[in-house]
Design a protein with these regions (language model features):
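Condensing-enzyme catalytic core mediating Claisen C-C bond formation in acyl metabolism
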Residues: 1-34, 132-173
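Acidic, glycine-rich active-site loops and adjacent beta-strand->loop/helix elements
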Residues: 65-70, 92-93, 118-124
Length: 173
C-alpha cells in the first residue's frame, strides 16, 4: 500500500483529486508547523498501512525523513508505531533514498516488511531554509514553494495488497 497526504494548497492544484488525504488547513489542529508536518506524515503512514491491510506491528522497520533538524517530524510520526525507526535525510531525495534502502534491506533478507515515508511543510521549510513567515518579507512570483505533503509506501518480500508494480533503480553515467 502507498498513500499521499497533502496540505490545502496542494489539494487545490491539478493533482488534488489523486491524493489520499487533503488537510483542511496547514496547522492540522497542531500548535506548531513542525507538529503539523509530523501529523501529516503520520496520516500518510496510517493510510498506506490501511490500504495494504496491514497492522503497524507487521513492520520490521520504518525508514522516514523530512527537512527538519534531527528529522524530528518523522521521529514523532513514527514513535507511536512501536517499530524500529531509521531516520533518512536526503532533502528532496529522501523518499527515493528510503525506497532504495528499503528495497536493499528487503532483497538482502535484513527485513521482511518495512515502510518508507517522507514529508515536508511549507511553513517549517520557510523558517529553516529561507525567511520565517513572521519576518513579513514579500515573495517574488518565481520564488520556490516547498510542498506541504507526506508520502508513505510499504515494501515487502511477499506481495503487499494494493501495491504498485515493482520498480528498478538504475545508475546512469
Amino acid at each position: 500500500g502507498h498513500a499521499a497526504a497533502v496540505g490545502k494548497k496542494e489539494g487545490e492544484g491539478p493533482l488534488g483529486e489523486r491524493f489520499d488525504y487533503v488537510a483542511k488547513n496547514d496547522r492540522m489542529g497542531q500548535r506548531s508547523w513542525e507538529l503539523a508536518e509530523s501529523e501529516l506524515q503520520k496520516t500518510a503512514i496510517r493510510l498506506a498501512l490501511r490500504k495494504a491491510t496491514l497492522p503497524e506491528r507487521s513492520l520490521d522497520l520504518i525508514l522516514a525523513g523530512d527537512l527538519l533538524n534531527q528529522c524530528i517530524g518523522s521521529f514523532l510520526a513514527s514513535m507511536h508505531a512501536n517499530v524500529p525507526y531509521l531516520g533518512q535525510y536526503g532533502a528532496c531525495s529522501t523518499m527515493a533514498q528510503g525506497l532504495a534502502l528499503g528495497g536493499c534491506l528487503v532483497e538482502s533478507g535484513a527485513a521482511d516488511r518495512l515502510l518508507a515515508a517522507a514529508s515536508s511543510h511549507f511553513c517549517s521549510a520557510e523558517r529553516q531554509y529561507r525567511f520565517p513567515l513572521a519576518y513579513g518579507g514579500q515573495r517574488t512570483p518565481t520564488a520556490q514553494w516547498t510542498a506541504t505533503a507526506a508520502g508513505a509506501a510499504v515494501l515487502g518480500s511477499e506481495p503487499v495488497p494494493n501495491s504498485a508494480e515493482p520498480c528498478d533503480v538504475r545508475v546512469t553515467h
